[in-house]
Amino acid sequence: MDLANHGLILLQQLNAQREFGFLCDCTVAIGDVYFKAHKSVLASFSNYFKMLFVHQTSECVRLKPTDIQPDIFSYLLHLMYTGKMAPQLIDPVRLEQGIKFLHAYPLIQEASLASQGAFSHPDQVFPLASSLYGIQIADHQLRQATKIASAPEKLGRDPRPQTSRISQEQVPEASQLSQLTSNLAQVNRTNMTPSDPLQTSLSPELVSTPVPPPPPGEETNLEASSSDEQPASLTIAHVKPSIMKRNGSFPKYYACHLCGRRFTLRSSLREHLQIHTGVPFTSSQQGESRVPLTLCSNAADLGKDAMEVPEAGMISDSELQHISDSPIIDGQQQSETPPPSDIADIDNLEQADQEREVKRRKYECTICGRKFIQKSHWREHMYIHTGKPFKCSTCDKSFCRANQAARHVCLNQSIDTYTMVDKQTLELCTFEEGSQMDNMLVQTNKPYKCNLCDKTFSTPNEVVKHSCQNQNSDVFALDEGRSILLGSGDSEVTEPDHPVLASIKKEQETVLLD
């Protein structure tokens, strides 16, 4: 069972989200105009965006106004979200070019039918309607748009549009010269035909809508006030209330005035300047780069120029992807990656970590030199060298802890079964009384017997605390004296039992005699 108007409700909700910028995961920038949209909707109608989002994860897509104009993209975006033609007159030629650029094949048939039925003069450029749909426009763009409408004579004398530094860096010198000569030729034609200087001096790419000239009195006043400013590349006079100002989420680029490389960090730009000057880069203790006094003026001018944000000539998506993958943009966002002067030495960090780890590991094995953080870990490691201190008298199985020996049950266990405790090992490993729960587990029916004097005790702590005063203690003292003799170097006593030590000592004596 199909629900009525389900698709219409979905389109209305998506369009409302787009106009308010809610849940929009993509921003399309065309010059100074920014469109909020959803990637899924754009990819559904445009193969261009579909392939772009496959290979690019950026949330901002920058397009050139020469590829598709903002009014055309707004018209197509409204058609994608609503399925209806906007109440807006659009040039069919530019509309067809925009559809071909976006590869929006599902919209070709609808746009062609609308253009054939609604437009009888395809060569005429119609004005924009009262609104563009879901866009953002910079504040200076609106101010310059009102001034260009009232200063046609100023525009005729200086027809060069204001372009961003990114587009100027990518265009070769030959293309810039050819564009300059074409603009000069257009200026000459406007001087010869003064009837309509605004429409004939600029190409349709620079001015999308003709604006009627103001009265002569107002023209002179506005011309004097805007003598130091250049005209904008797009004239958009009406926006919707949902349009917001440009925020600081878009990255700023710091461009080198010598080679054109761009950086997102000013410190990276300062380091790059040393390549051109040949002066080695040095950093102070505060982590800030020091530049020679001869470069202060250039660096100051460069910093002012670099603060300008790309405006009219935005790069396309393919060029943006190429720039993001290439090493041209060396710096990253300051919140993600600090400048090189703020990054500490890796060797010093590793050395500090090692010293900190040594302070933490204060329990050291006297035999192999390993260090441990907890005393219990060190004690269990010592049992590797000395042997486990608790042993079952029936099955001769050894245990590290007393509670393990207490829980142990043998198949051949009898009433006479006991746990043999190695007193030497416990004294060497500084056996300590455990928690109350461990003591409850240790107190079992099996007694604990000392391996030196064969005395029986109820807990292993009593075995450690008692003193052996019989023959076995004397034997233990003799064994300790023998170990001391092994270390002192008496070769006559230790030679039959330790031939390896005797041979080493003989070699040392021969070396001393030679």
Swiss-Prot record:
Domain BTB: 24-89
Polar residues: compositionally biased ranges: 161-200, 222-231
Name of one Pfam family that matches: BTB
Keywords in alphabetical order: DNA-binding, Isopeptide bond, Metal-binding, Nucleus, Phosphoprotein, Repeat, Transcription, Transcription regulation, Ubl conjugation, Zinc, Zinc-finger
Stretches the record annotates as Disordered: 149-231
Recorded name of the encoding gene: ZBTB2
Covalent cross-link (Glycyl lysine isopeptide (Lys-Gly) (interchain with G-Cter in SUMO2)), residues: 147, 154, 362, 465, 505-506
Entry-linked InterPro entries: BTB/POZ_dom, SKP1/BTB/POZ_sf, Znf_C2H2_sf, Znf_C2H2_type
UniProt GO BP: negative regulation of transcription by RNA polymerase II; regulation of cytokine production; regulation of immune system process
Source species of the chain: Homo sapiens
Protein name: Zinc finger and BTB domain-containing protein 2
Modified residues annotated as Phosphoserine in this record: 341
Subcellular location: Nucleus
Function summary: May be involved in transcriptional regulation.
Cellular component GO terms held in the UniProt record: nucleoplasm
PANTHER family in UniProt: ZINC FINGER AND BTB DOMAIN CONTAINING 2, ZINC FINGER PROTEIN
Keyword Zinc-finger listed: yes
UniProt KW Ubl conjugation keyword: yes
